Amino acid sequence: MNTQNEYYGSVGLLYTPIKYVSATLTTDLTRSMLDNNFVNGPNPKRMASQSVLAVQYKNSRFTATGSLLGTYITDKVEQGEKPDDKRRLSPAVSLSWRPFSESTLRIRASYKDIFRVPTFTDLYYLRMGNTNLKPEETSQYNVGVTWSSSCGDWLRHFSISADGYYNTVKDKIVALPTMYVWKMMNMGEVDIKGVDVNLSTQFRLPLRMSLLLASTYSFQYAVDVTDPEAKNYKDQIPYTPRHSGTVSVTLENPWVNVSYILTAVGDRYALPQNIDRNRI
């Protein structure tokens, strides 16, 4: 039996030196503890500090934001090995532009440097955990467009968004089956190219009811590029479908809301090589 507790605190400052320009400084502190009833269990404790300095310029048609995230994480364990302390600076930049003042069309672009530390489950879960895991490092580039509108009383809202992205991932954390149990591992280097499309509408119905329709589609080409000589070079990484999507229908009324969600995914592979016997 596992029991995890977390204590969280945050403080932030906002400064607006001139019109359209603002600066923020925030710090989050998290204390996490995992206890279990296993003999000689690690019972890890984690202290995490995340501080963000961000500067933003924003007017009615253009927004630009730059930020720098500083992360420090340290673990302590009662038994066994503990991972090294983690320190990292992660920059990010985002832009959003509305080219026509009379339209809701927006064009956006962003760059993020993402640093993901292994979770307690990744590191310490019985038989599956791996204290030798390295943090997952990602450089993420994104370009997209959004548009929304209202078309009279019967169509309250319609919106569409489309984004294309390219990610380079180092030491991606994945779960892979071994002879008897699953094991958390790093996958060297992974290239990810993808497209996300989202549609949503809301219709007004009689008797104070409304109908919400939404759909999403994702294409993700995520391939292992660690070793050009390996058999799985440029093969799709395990348990990551190239195609996936959802469709949802929701009926809202003053008494009870009813929803139906359909999710579909394409072929995936249980192991790094994309061969028929590994397909699921």
Predicted features by range, described:
Residues 1, 34-42, 76-83, 119-126, ...:
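Outer-membrane beta-barrel translocator domains and adjoining extracellular loop/strand segments
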Residues 1, 30-34, 71-75, 112-118, ...:
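Structural signature of outer-membrane beta-barrel domains
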Residues 1-91, 161-164, 199-201, 208-216:
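Face-selective signature of the C-terminal outer-membrane beta-barrel domain
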Residues 15-21, 56-63, 89, 97-101, ...:
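Outer-membrane beta-barrel strand-turn architecture
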Residues 19, 61, 159-168, 185-273:
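Gram-negative outer-membrane beta-barrel transporters
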Residues 22-26, 54, 63-67, 92, ...:
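Residue-level detector of the transmembrane beta-barrel scaffold of outer-membrane proteins
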Residues 100, 107-110, 135-193, 198-202:
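Membrane-embedded beta-barrel scaffold of Gram-negative outer-membrane proteins
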